[in-house]
Regions:
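Small-residue helix/turn framework positions
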Residues: 1-177
Length: 179
């Protein structure tokens, strides 16, 4: 389900059209989404919200965005490849932890929650997840056996860099690009 509210379009045919509003997508199937892109397999459901969105000349200027696990009971699994790609969005910790430990023998892991937030202002995203920690934020909160928790460490990420990380994670079957 996708709902757009408070949408305002100004100067639509001008040199710098502006679009403002809120987009909400609910209960998206992660299995379908991750099969569409070369990201790694995930099972579950997510909600996506873009509030206070402002596009100028069809490019993002500001928004408050979040991707979070949907409420309800459903299978929650994440592949090692998806863990590595998610790690590339917020830091390299989980990918390195898998490669150094016995966790590398598992292909999939259970999770309790997934969440990533981005507050875009002045071309910089202030990043967050399902919970904050002293070192950063939790992107994937483990649950079940085997489980894994994925942390993000970069609180501020340039918009263009984040878009590049997402493109790299969704367009290749190789490891994440971490700078």
């Amino acid at each position: 389900i996708m709902v757009a509210t408070n949408m305002q379009l100004s100067d639509a045919l001008g040199a710098a059209p502006q679009l403002q509003g809120t987009l909400v997508m609910s209960n998206l199937d992660l299995d379908t989404l991750t099969k569409t892109f070369s990201f790694g397999k995930m099972q579950g459901r997510i909600d996506m919200v873009l509030e206070n969105m402002l596009l100028s000349n069809w490019k993002p200027v500001s928004f408050d965005g979040r991707v979070m696990s949907s409420e309800g009971k459903y299978p929650r699994k994440i592949s090692q490849q998806a863990v590595q790609n998610i790690s590339s969005l917020g830091g390299a910790g989980a990918a390195a932890a898998i490669q150094r430990s016995f966790l590398r023998i598992f292909e999939t892991f259970g999770y309790r929650k997934i969440g990533l937030t981005c507050k875009l202002r002045n071309t910089v995203c202030e990043m967050g997840g399902v919970a904050d920690t002293a070192q950063g934020y939790v992107i994937v909160q483990g649950g079940g056996i085997p489980s894994i928790t994925v942390m993000g460490y970069n609180r501020q990420v340039g918009w263009e860099e984040l878009v590049g990380r997402i493109k790299a994670a969704t367009q290749s079957n190789v490891g994440p690009v971490v700078k």
